[in-house]
Amino acid sequence: MEFSVKSGSPEKQRSACIVVGVFEPRRLSPIAEQLDKISDGYISALLRRGELEGKPGQTLLLHHVPNVLSERILLIGCGKERELDERQYKQVIQKTINTLNDTGSMEAVCFLTELHVKGRNNYWKVRQAVETAKETLYSFDQLKTNKSEPRRPLRKMVFNVPTRRELTSGERAIQHGLAIAAGIKAAKDLGNMPPNICNAAYLASQARQLADSYSKNVITRVIGEQQMRELGMNAYLAVGHGSQNESLMSVIEYKGNPSEDARPIVLVGKGLTFDSGGISIKPSEGMDEMKYDMCGAAAVYGVMRMVAELKLPINVIGVLAGCENMPGGRAYRPGDVLTTMSDQTVEVLNTDAEGRLVLCDVLTYVERFEPEAVIDVATLTGACVIALGHHITGLMSNHNPLAHELIGASEQAGDRAWRLPLGDEFQEQLESNFADMANIGGRPGGAITAGCFLSRFTRKYNWAHLDIAGTAWRSGKAKGATGRPVALLSQFLLNRAGFNGEE
């Protein structure tokens, strides 16, 4: 689908469809008023007859409106004018895309960027419209034999901006929106792949393909089990012992800043391509969704794709920590004591608390890059789902400025995160009689104690942890990966690169 921006009055638009908003109760938006005036009151007359109230989600498609060059006008209900927020704006865009697709419009000029969204500028509105449009049109049908295609799919969307001065920021918004949307799609595609296809080797192949596609700035190295043993990554290796699939760690290095002094931002993604729970096996109900336990790695992959596509002037390293947690004759057991790469020892009380065992060794490994900051992304705890539900990602950090940056980026991107504490009193729950620490700390504050566990391996750099257990995928009829938190991390890196969208 092609996107562009232009600046012009609606009466001069010659298109298959013009899209404008209507507020409650039957109030035309400024552009809709212009079209009404051109058509000698044709639109307002329809509203007076009760054809459209302007409630959110309502639509009215008009054909051959008098004196209007475009074939059709799509009126979209936007609710009460002063109450239009970011979430409702995205819902309006989503409804627009679905309606245009369902009614066979192949192109449209969209004036919805004129809508007032509190605290948001035209750059934000155009970029969010692009991201939302791509999200709305997403489908995962690679493995289906019968693929459904819209009769006349929407191919071109033009966003109108108020003045020619805003064309440049509008074009940048489209560029950024397309790159972020492509990253989200890549993350969703990886997450939705079944575990018999998407194993650690598959993740590694995708990482290599990324380097091939962006060979000027991207290098990928894949570290196998033999090299992990030499490095002392015993906790990571233990998790994969029960599986016949080799554990592989894919390291994607992007260099956009040629300065020798430029330190990288490191992103670490948990990549459990299937998590049965191991010997502490999970209940069978819903176990199919444990293919989504690699969504942290999928998100990091999507972000690295975005960074490479936009050629951001920063250095970023993405680590996909791929492995599979299965029961078997070689599987690690409750009661085992593991010596991690940091030489700290861990008593395993539950083999289903495996993500932190993988991550702790990777967090030690990335010390070699002397990072400016490290952010790990993981579907880590069911406790985070209980605490924050399926709408907000959990955030923990050992560095207040980094945490504030990430919270700010989450608000900018509409991919929200909420900070949880890392108090010393929670560390006490990880005490073990037989090792330096246990891998679980009991039910109380489970998301926080998991973060506390990881914090013991991050003392040499500024670090943040994103627990996406509640936000990485949806269950039920709409089952599928969400691609979160690609948008959050993309915004964070755009801000670090100097593109904060405040034009």
Swiss-Prot record:
An example Gene Ontology CC term for this record: cytoplasm
Molecular function as annotated in GO: manganese ion binding; metalloaminopeptidase activity
PROSITE patterns per record: CYTOSOL_AP (PS00631)
UniProt-listed SUPFAM superfamilies: Macro domain-like (SSF52949), Zn-dependent exopeptidases (SSF53187)
Residues involved in Mn(2+) 2 binding: K270, D275, D293, E354
GO BP term, pick one: proteolysis
Main location: cytoplasm
Gene3D superfamilies, alphabetized: Leucine Aminopeptidase, subunit E, domain 1, Zn peptidases
Family: Belongs to the peptidase M17 family.
Name the UniProt record assigns to this protein: Probable cytosol aminopeptidase
